[in-house]
Amino acid sequence: MDRLPLPHALHVPTHRPFAAPLPPRRLLARLAALMLCGVPLAVLAQAQPSQDAAPAEPPPALRSSPRLQEVLPYGIRQQLPVFVRGDRVTGQPDIQATIEGNAELRRGDTVVHADRMQYDVADDRARASGNVLINRAGNRYEGSQLDLRVEAFTGFFSDARYRFLETAAHGQASRVDFLDRDRSVVHNATYTTCERTDEASWQPDWILRAERIHLDRVEDVGTAENGVLEFKGVPVLPIPRITFPLSDRRKSGLLPPTLGLDSVSGFEYAQPYYWNIAPNRDATITPTVMTRRGVALGTEFRYLEPRYSGELTADYMPNDRLRDRDRWAYGIKHRATFDTPAGGVGLGIDIKRVSDDNYWRDFSQRNSGRSGVNDQLTQRLLPGDATLNWARGEHSLLLRTLKWQTLQDVNAPIIPPYDRMPQLRWEYRPLQLAGGLDASVEADYTSFHADRAYTGQPNAKRSYTMAQVSRPFLAPAGFITPRVQLHSTHYEFDAPLANGQRTASRTLPTFSLDSGLVFERDARYFGRDFLQTLEPRAFYTYTPYRDQRLLPIYDTAVNDFNFASIYTENAFGGQDRLADNNLLTLGVTTRLLDPDTGAEAARFGVAQRVRFSDQEVTMPGGSPVNERLSDVLLGAGINWTPQWGFDSTVQYNPKTGRSLRTTVGARYSPGNYRTVSAAYRMQKVTGLITEPSEQIDVGWQWPLNDLWGDRGDKPSSAGGRWYSVGRLNYSLQDRKLVDTVVGLEYESCCWIGRVVLERLQRSVTSSNTRLMFQIEFIGFSRLSLGSNPLSSLKQNVPRYQFLRESVSTPSRFTQYD
């Protein structure tokens, strides 16, 4: 087989090199390697000085790079050699070459194969016929006839078939016009990502047929004109003009529309437009039409900078027919950090505001994709929060303003939290103290404001200081940590208290002693080796009694009774109550650890408080705690294998012999797209909980193909895969389903279909039901009917996995010729 390097090929200097001469073949290989790494040919020539010339400077050295430079500079690309070969090569040097039989032309990342080819050197023009194939950076074109200027990549291809590397999309056309290296126009074209088989009767599940498709590799965007989208051989959507991605890069344009039908808004059509402003800025504008309510406009703007980032959202609906008024909402999120000579500074803003008290009920599902009884409190409390932080060394400052918007329901009013206008906090935490001591000082000033019609108590300015000193004694086998705290609080009220005073003060010390031991032994259970620990712990705390019944409550509540709070000094969270404790908490935990990795396979724990005197300090309306023995906390967690998980917490009252609170959860996740979880939650009436509840929660995602023996993870060309997915929340107390999300997913090689039924509780007496459909054409677009089921599944189903996770772009050498 003949091989003819043309004038664009590497030029080998004829003079003798400075060092011992290299054989021509080795020299050519070295020059080619340098050229591929981006070294200009002019530099290569200079690197070969004459024998008589002294070297003026050291030869160029290669620089390390994290990746191979695929896009060469124009000057380098112009000097790339052209190589041709075939069964028979004829022609004139520097003019033209004719290759017959297995003809091949190579230049850079472009390779042309054909039965016959003619190459004109002066015009850099290749004409090929018969089984023509172009491979350019992994993108392949096949056809009958080609006329191409190789470097400029301009010309045409007749009767072409094509396949693109990044999306695995392919199709055919009567003609492909190459406009330049990055742009082309495909005429009478088809486009699909369905995997082609060798069967003569093969037809793709979906295909786009268009009069023209413009392909832009700079923007990675395809634009189809005068087209129609076919699914299963049936035209489903006429497309006068549409853009679609040629890679995973973001692009401006219309996003797939969303069509919905629910019991509140009626039929809903939303058409989002995505604006890719810059690599670090984008916006989404979504006009929406609702048959029962009118039109709405939603906007979202995001930005990201090295020192700050944020998000702005706004929604507006003029004359909502549901409430006969304008509806609006906006949100601002901003986070920033700055380095200054005086220390680090941070800024945070989180503001949410809506037009009226019914907004959470009328818009919560459309905006967030989720609503429910457990979510309502958060949706009804909208923050207006701004914080400014400063830190340097051992000191830090915080300045904060927080103003809530509380959305009230006349049938279920809630007490709004207090606004903090403003709050100023200083903390001092020395890093090194003599004698192994740890110490800190925290001082806070807050002005609390709220509507007295709801709170029933005066507003106030509160100042407090808390100083503490501890001395940890640490050893591998255990620890002892004595701690002393001093709390000082002062109030100034805007109205007199019941005793007629407008001020109040309180100063209290607290002493605590925390201690624990750690025993270890080798153990073996169920044929498996473990390192077993036994960790007894004792925690004693004492705070003297001080009458605090007249002090209002601004930011304080009873701590939840759990393994985290049982070993703390105060039974209350916040600064308005300090419990008069004289108690000892005893507990023990045992763990089974993997001796090689340290992973926890099992954990069992028990803890109980022993009270030596009554706790007289309570929340308003509360009763003193006089039980000498508290409820017993029992906890267990088992992760015997990564596939299985079990967790349980029980609050047991030894006096009544009954459990006041029980939580049991289990999970089985043997592989991708396979997970089942179940939970049981029971809560009796306690001093903290006024409404009992008992619920069962089940969630799952599982391929139905497993039922008939098809246990793969991905679909094949022989058929797709069915998945069942959902979550059920059932109230045993009310004997009804509270929340329901159930659906089916079907994954083919090139499309995904989803149907989801969602029924979520809006209030104690009402719910909203939605039926959602979606078909996703892989590598092209996604069409939804009934809002977005993906959002609902991700937010409601524990450990839900998208059927098509993002993957890295394949190398162009996966389709190398």
UniProtKB/Swiss-Prot annotation:
Subcellular location: Cell outer membrane
Annotated TM spans: none
One GO cellular component term: transporter complex
Family annotation (InterPro entries): LipoPS_assembly_LptD (IPR020889), LptD (IPR050218), LptD_2 (IPR045659), LptD_C (IPR007543)
Primary location recorded for the protein, binned into one broad class: membrane
Source species, domain of life: Bacteria
GO BP: Gram-negative-bacterium-type cell outer membrane assembly; lipopolysaccharide transport
Signal peptide (from-to): 1-45
Keyword tags: Cell outer membrane, Membrane, Signal
Keyword Membrane (UniProt): yes
A matching Pfam family: LptD_2
Family statement drawn from the similarity comment of this UniProt entry: Belongs to the LptD family.
Subunit structure: Component of the lipopolysaccharide transport and assembly complex. Interacts with LptE and LptA.
Primary role: Together with LptE, is involved in the assembly of lipopolysaccharide (LPS) at the surface of the outer membrane.
The name this protein goes by in its record: LPS-assembly protein LptD
Organism field: Acidovorax sp. (strain JS42)
Higher taxonomy: Bacteria, Pseudomonadati, Pseudomonadota, Betaproteobacteria, Burkholderiales
